Amino acid sequence: NRVAFAKMASTLADGKSRLLRKIAGDLDHGGKQVLKPDSTGYKILARFVRRVSGKPDDGPAVADYDAPPFFDGVEMMPPQRLLRRITLSLAARLPTKDERAAVERDGLEAVNSILDSVMKDDAFYDRLQEAFNDILLVRGYDGGGEGALSYEHFKTRLWYQDRSPRKGLSPEKQRELFPYSHPKMIAYTKLVNDYREGMLREPLELIAHIVRNERPFTEIVTADYIMVSPYTARGYGVYDELQDKFNDPDDPFEFIPTKIKSLTDRNGRKVQESATGFFPHAGLLSSFQYLKRYPTTETNRNRLRVRMYFLHFLGIDLMQLAPRVNDAAAITAQYEIPTMQAADCVVCHKVMDPVAGLLQDYYVVDGKGIYGPRKDGWYKDMFAPGLENEGLPDNERWRSLQWLGERTAKDPRFPVAMVEHVWYILTGRKPLLPPEDIDDPLFSAKRRAYRVQRDETERIADVFVEADFNLKVAFKELVQSPYYRVDGLASTVNNPRRRAELDDVGLVRLLTPEQLERKLTAVFGQEWGRLTHRESKFKILYGGIDSKAVTERMTDPSGAMGAIQRIMSNDVACKNVALDFSREPSDRLLFPNIDLSVVPGGDAEAKARIRQAIVHLHQRLLGRE
C-alpha cells in the first residue's frame, strides 16, 4: 500500500504533485476538496510527498514539543487518604483501625489485601450493581419489573394478584374494606414492589454473582443461567422446584442461579426450538430485562440492540464510526437496497446487520415480552446473520446468542471494554477518546494524553485476562495505578501543551446522590434520606438518573445542587450534633472528648480539648490529619 501511495504521490500534474492537487480540489474529481492548502493535514501530506520524491525535508508540520515523563510534577495521594477513598467509594464505610494501622506500617503494599476484604463486603456489591446500571441502564425499561416477561410465555408473571386482599371484591367494597392505608394493603403493596424490584435487579445480580464468586467475567455474555429470587422465581413459574434451594424463601432479594426451560405458550405448546430443552441463556445478551430495555421496531430491525452490544461489550460506538452521507436522498434513489449496495451505507451495515440477524428470534415489536420470531421470516434485504465475516451455521440458529457470546468472550476488545467500565466506576469519567481535530494546536498533547491512558488501560486488560477475567483484579490494578492515586500538581503548569496533557488527570468528581447518602451514613452513623428515598424529589435535581428519561449523571454542579447542599448541611449538622451529645462520650462519633465543662475561652485544658475536637472532626469529615 505504501509503495502504491508513494507512486501516486510522485505523479505530476502541471509540474505539481497530482495527489496534492486533487486533495486540494484543484483537479476535477468526485472527492472534491478534502484538505485546505493551509491545513495541518495538507502540510503533513506535502511533507510526505517531498520525502518520497527525494526532496529535502523542511521540518515537521507541527512544532516539536519536548514532553517530560507523563506524571512528572504530579503528586500522588498519601496511602492513608487513598485508603479512605477506597473504603468510602467501594464499601461505603470509613477505614477500620486495623486497616489504618496496616497502611501506616506497610504503605501501598497493604492496600492489596485490604481491597480483598473490601470486595467481600455486601456494600461493594450494592455499589457494583448501581455502577453497572449507570452503564447498562437496564433498570429503565417500560412496563414495571414484570413487563420483561410475556403473558403468553409466563402465565404466572402476575402471581401476586392472587394475594391481594381486594381479590374478588367489588370496587366499592375494595375501597371500603381495604383502603391503601389498611395494614394488609400496605403489606400487599410492599410485596408487589419487592417483586418488581427483584425483576429489575436480576441482570445486575448476575454481575454481582460472577464477581463475588470470582468467576470469569466473560460470563456476562456466556452464562447459561439466570439469577432468580423467591419472588421472581414465581414469575417464571419455577418456584416449586427451587424453593428448597433458598436459605429464606420469604426473602425477596436472595438470588440463586438457575435455568428455565425452553418457552411454551399458555397452553403448553412448544414455541421455542432447543436441542437441550432449556432456554439458550447467554448472560446479559439473552436477558429478558436487557432486551426489554433496548426494544426493536419494524424499521429499527434490532439495530439499536446491536449498537448497545458493541458499546457495552466491545467498547465501540458504531455511531461515531459511521461516515456522514452527503446526500441520503440521492443514494436512496440510486440503489434498490442502499444498506447492501451503497458504499457509504455498507461500511456500517456490513458490521451491524449480521448481528441484528442473530437477534431475530427476539423480535417482539408490541412491547409484550421479548421472545418471538418475525412472522414473515427474517428480512432478505439485510446481510445474513453472523459476526464480522463469520456466518451463523444453520444448526446454531436456535442458540444464536450463545454463539455470539462465545465469540465476544474471545474478542480482544472485550477485556479492554470491561476495564474501561471499571475506569468509569472508579473515576466517574469515561476514558479519553482519540482527538480528531488535527488542526488543533494542542492536538499532539491531547493525543499523548489519550495514548498514555490507553496504554494503562491495555496493560490492566492484559493482567485481567491473565487472571482468568477476574474483575476484582481489574479493580485492584486500577486502584493502585497513578491515575487513581493522583492528588494534584506539585507546582503551577504554564505550558499550554502540558496543561492539555494533564487536563483529564485527577479524581475531582461529584458524588452521586446514592454515594453522598452512603458517605453521610459512614461519617455520621445515619443517612440523611432525602436524596434517595423512593418519593424524594431531590434525587434527579442532585444529578441522579432514572435509567429511562434521565440517563446521564451530572458532572458539573448546578444552582439546584447548591440549594440542596445548604438544606442538607443544616439538617445533618443540627440533627447529628444534638444526637451525638445525647450519647455517652465513649460512644460518640463527632465529639468524644467534649462535655458540659468545656467552653470556649476556658482554661488551658478546655482549649486543648477544643483543638483536639477540631482535629478529630477534620480527620473524620475530610480525611485529613
Question: What does each model-identified segment do?
Answer:
Residues 19, 82-90, 114-119, 128-136, ...:
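Short alpha-helical scaffolding segments that buttress acidic/His motifs in well-ordered protein cores
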Residues 1-138, 234, 376-432, 439-442, ...:
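Aromatic- and Gly/Pro-enriched helix-to-coil junctions and flexible linker segments
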Residues 55, 93-97, 124-126, 137-145, ...:
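Secretory-pathway/luminal and periplasmic proteins that interact with or process carbohydrate-rich
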Residues 129-236, 240, 250-262, 269-276, ...:
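Non-catalytic, conformational "gating/processing" segments within enzyme and secreted inhibitor domains
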Residues 33-34, 61-62, 97-102, 128-134, ...:
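Short coil/turn segments at secondary-structure boundaries
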Residues 74-83, 107-110, 120, 124, ...:
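Secondary-structure capping and boundary motifs in well-ordered enzyme cores
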Residues 56-77, 83-93, 98-121, 361-389, ...:
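Substrate/cofactor-recognition hotspot
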Residues 1, 13-16, 21, 27-45, ...:
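Sequence context surrounding c-type heme c attachment/ligation sites in exported
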